[in-house]
A protein has these predicted regions:
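A broad, low-specificity signal marking well-ordered, structured residues that form hydrophobic/aromatic
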Residues: 50-52, 133, 185-186, 209, ...
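N-terminal export/ancillary region detector
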Residues: 38-39, 73-75
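Short, charged interaction patches at domain edges and termini
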Residues: 1-10, 59-65, 106-164, 193-206, ...
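A structural signal for the main folded, soluble domain(s) of proteins
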Residues: 84, 181-190, 195-199, 223
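Small/polar-rich, solvent-exposed N-terminal microdomains that initiate assembly or binding
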Residues: 1-63, 96-110, 140-192, 290-291
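Extracellular/virion structural assembly segments
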Residues: 67, 75-103, 147-148, 199-241, ...
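Residues in well-ordered beta-strands of folded domains
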Residues: 53-55, 73, 134-136, 189, ...
């Protein structure tokens, strides 16, 4: 599904408790873009409120390729359910979940603000009120390049040593991934790298690999971060896909950093080598065979 369809599925499938959304053509009144007119025949039982509309503004981001802002408007009437009764559920179903739209990078949303409003739109006898819930969107583009690849090496490390952790960036992610305390998620990216030591046969690259750890609650994230950092510190290296080592010369962890934006584990001065010359294989000349 595309991102707007994933958002519709997530919002329309939410449990709003005693609050029942208006129905339009037999479905919950959730719309991407403007809502239909109140006089539209699609409204069931002539009830148009409460209803929800949402819009998405995307922008380019040099670090994450895609970022954006999601606006969710909750529309109610003064004598019906209050917007404040619906807003917490909107936040709950959209925050802390990783969505994987088809043909696009996985993404997640972070709540930014909620602002009430009084609409100029009104019914015959009722005033229309509502709340606009704003979310920041962050994408998780695949950062795998060429072998030896430090991001691919870190994904291999997590896959082999922490099979309970979901790796963001794989092609087989489901539509929705909700990290839990027992099954968190991780996203690895290469922030920067440069040429370090150089020899006749090998060039050593030094870079910074950042790991974003996703789990509900600061305490559960802190436990996972501590466990991962302790294990990496004991190892001192991560084996890459070509079986060569990537040395970890500096590891910095900060549990207060936002996992969506900055990432909490910074592998600074991660060092890996690339061969300057491919291995030479002597050819065999003048082959003679006897039958």
């Amino acid at each position: 599904m595309k991102l707007e369809e994933l958002l519709f599925t997530r919002i329309s499938g939410a449990d709003f408790g005693s609050v029942k959304l208006a129905q339009f053509d037999g479905k919950p009144g959730v719309f991407f873009g403007p809502c239909p007119e109140d006089t539209d025949r699609g409204w069931t039982d002539a009830r148009q409120y409460p209803r929800i509309s949402y819009g998405l503004d995307l922008r380019g981001d040099p670090d994450r390729q895609t970022a954006g802002t999601l606006y969710v408007d909750v529309w109610c009437t003064e004598d019906g359910p209050a917007p404040e009764d619906i807003e917490p559920t909107i936040r709950a179903v959209l925050c802390g979940v990783i969505m994987a739209p088809e043909e696009d990078a996985p993404c997640s949303f972070s709540w930014q603000a909620s602002q009430t409003f009084r609409s100029s739109r009104e019914t015959v006898v009722e005033k229309v009120i509502g709340v606009t819930v704003t979310f920041d969107m962050y994408a998780f583009p695949e950062q795998i390049t060429s072998d030896p690849d430090p991001v691919l090496a870190m994904q291999k490390y997590f896959r082999e040593n922490y099979p309970e952790i979901t790796i963001i960036g794989r092609a087989d992610l489901p539509d929705f991934t909700e990290p839990t305390e027992e099954h968190p998620a991780v996203y690895c990216r290469l922030e920067s790298y440069e040429l370090g030591r150089e020899y006749r046969t090998v060039a050593w690259l030094e870079g910074t690999v950042i790991c974003h750890i996703f789990a509900p609650g600061a305490s559960s994230r802190a436990r996972w971060i501590r466990a991962i950092v302790d294990d990496l510190s004991r190892r001192g290296e991560v084996i890459m896909m070509d079986t060569s080592p990537m040395f970890l010369r500096s590891i910095r962890a900060d549990t207060t950093l936002d996992p969506l934006v900055h990432g909490q584990i910074h592998l600074k001065k991660a060092t890996w080598g690339i061969l300057k010359n491919p291995p030479y294989h002597h050819g065999i000349n003048h082959i003679h065979t006897n039958d």
